[in-house]
């Protein structure tokens, strides 16, 4: 099995019996966290990590580009598409996506050099506002905003979760990661 994942995405493999899965592609539905390992964005699942068997892998980028939607059998376009598939399996409780695990200054630097830096700069958010957003435990941007709305600024409220919901390594080593736990 080949898993493609960003460095800030940790797939949860604990409850998966890979021998029983017959689907061509696995999509991991992951909880999304900001700033700390236990500050979760509620009511949102990230689908960054994907997997397939080695013999099905065309390229890592092909797997990364797969749409995170299961298409109906009557969708004729799925026969000719390299990104639309019907034979997906979504892995619920599929892991953790840790984004912006940085302080305010590092987040500002990231967003200024980020792909959407023009959108960030158009919102006129400064370092003090980023610090305020982090202290109030809100997401730096709204992941549900479309292009007509302002994405950056005060996003949804984050919730603090119990340590039993974070990866075992983090849970078992709180002294190492205490700075990154709220």
Per-segment meaning from a language model:
Residues 2:
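Short aromatic/hydrophobic "clamp" motif used to bind/position activated sugar donors
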Residues 9-122:
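Conserved catalytic core of nucleotide-sugar-dependent glycosyltransferases
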Residues 86-182:
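C-terminal accessory extensions appended to soluble enzyme cores
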């Amino acid at each position: 099995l080949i898993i493609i994942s960003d460095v800030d995405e940790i797939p949860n493999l604990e409850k998966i019996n890979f021998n029983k899965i017959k689907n061509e592609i696995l999509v991991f539905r992951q909880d999304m966290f900001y700033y700390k390992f236990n500050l979760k964005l509620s009511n949102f699942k990230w689908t960054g990590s994907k997997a397939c068997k080695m013999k099905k892998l065309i390229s890592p980028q092909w797997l990364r580009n797969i749409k995170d939607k299961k298409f109906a059998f009557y969708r004729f376009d799925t026969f000719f598409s390299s990104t639309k598939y019907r034979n997906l399996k979504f892995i619920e409780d599929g892991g953790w996506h840790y984004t912006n695990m940085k302080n305010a200054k590092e987040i500002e630097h990231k967003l200024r050099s980020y792909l959407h830096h023009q959108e960030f700069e158009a919102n006129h958010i400064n370092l003090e506002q980023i610090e305020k957003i982090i202290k109030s435990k809100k997401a730096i941007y709204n992941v549900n905003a479309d292009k007509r709305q302002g994405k950056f600024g005060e996003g949804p409220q984050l919730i603090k979760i119990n340590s039993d919901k974070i990866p075992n390594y983090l849970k078992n080593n709180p002294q190492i990661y205490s700075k990154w736990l709220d």
